[in-house]
Every structure is written in structure tokens, then in C-alpha cells.
Amino acid sequence: MKALQVAGTLMLLFCLLAAVNATPGQVYINGKCIDCNKPDNDPGIIIPPDHKSAGSMSYTLTSGAIFFGIIYHIFS
């Protein structure tokens, strides 16, 4: 495997891992949510109590897509 393929594979891996682990709509600075999607005191917006379990299926699907993309990139 060429060095350029290794570099491309690692770059693909790290970019996709950053996308999988990102929490959309929330920016945390010093432990406080600065840019959250939920406005203060708005009872009409319901947020699941456990944010990590709510998107576990999409994380699983994205992880499988990452694995397939890396294997395809290595062998092509």
C-alpha cells in the first residue's frame, strides 16, 4: 500500500469519526451550552433525557458506513 493511500485512509477515518461523534446544534464552552437548539423556557420542545441513547442507531449505521468506506478505499 502506498503512503498516499495510507494518508488518505487516515484522513477519511478521522474526518468521519469527527462527524459521528459530533452533537448537532450544541456548542459547549467551559461546560456550558452556548448555542443550543432549545430556547430557554420553551415547553413545546421535547428533548430526550439521555442524549447518548437517542442517536445510538444512527451512530451504529454511520460506523458501519465508515468501516465499509475505509475497506473499499484500501482495496481499490
Curated annotation (Swiss-Prot):
Subcellular location: Secreted
Signal peptide bounds: 1-22
UniProt-listed Pfam families: DIM
GO cellular component: extracellular region
Cystine pairings recorded for this chain: 33-36
Keywords: Disulfide bond, Immunity, Innate immunity, Secreted, Signal
GO aspect biological process, one term: innate immune response
Cleaved propeptide residues: 23-24
Superkingdom in the source lineage: Eukaryota
Family indicated by similarity: Belongs to the bomanin family.
Function in brief: Secreted immune-induced peptide induced by Toll signaling. Has a role in resistance to bacterial and fungal infections. The strength of antimicrobial activity appears to correlate with the overall level of expression.
Protein name: Bomanin Tailed 2
Gene: BomT2
